[in-house]
Design a protein with these regions (language model features):
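Catalytic phosphate/metal-binding cores of nucleic-acid and nucleotide-processing enzymes, i.e., regions
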Residues: 1-142
Length: 142
């Protein structure tokens, strides 16, 4: 399978994960047939970058998501938190965000700690989606 097909397949898999959690997610390219959207759209408040790569440089991936979400903000004024959802072959999906962005999702941290602003946190899909769903429910007032 070539890398483009692998990427499309990964985006569809991640969209399906969100659909199983109750979101109307779909591939960004499928959304309107052109670029300029996240890899998966239909999930409020976040910019989703999907990667299926055995040798992923997650820092470069999060930087790409940050650049792309900043460009989207310039066009729409919609501020989205970047997250990279990634996995290697035969492994589970993981979600990586900057620690400060994750803290804005989770609301607070039970202890004080000094962290670098470029610190990254990687969580399993199941842990991350619980944090995200609590944030989204609170923010939407549902």
């Amino acid at each position: 399978m070539n890398s483009r097909a692998k990427g499309v397949r990964g985006e569809l898999q991640v969209a399906h994960l969100f659909q199983k959690s109750g979101y109307k997610a779909e591939r960004g390219q499928q959304h309107d047939g052109r670029s300029g959207h996240a890899d998966v759209v239909g999930v409020p408040y976040i910019w989703i970058e999907v990667k299926r790569d055995q040798d992923l440089n997650v820092l470069k991936a999060i930087e790409q998501a940050e650049r792309d979400s900043a460009g989207y903000y310039e066009r729409t004024r919609e501020d989205l938190l970047p997250v990279v959802i990634h996995r290697k072959n035969r492994e589970e999906w993981k979600c990586t965000m900057r620690l400060l962005d994750l803290l804005s999702l989770s609301g607070s941290m039970p202890f004080a700690v000094a962290v670098p602003t470029d610190g990254l946190v990687t969580m399993t899909w199941s842990d991350w989606i619980r944090v995200y769903m609590a944030y989204e429910t609170e923010r939407s007032g549902a």
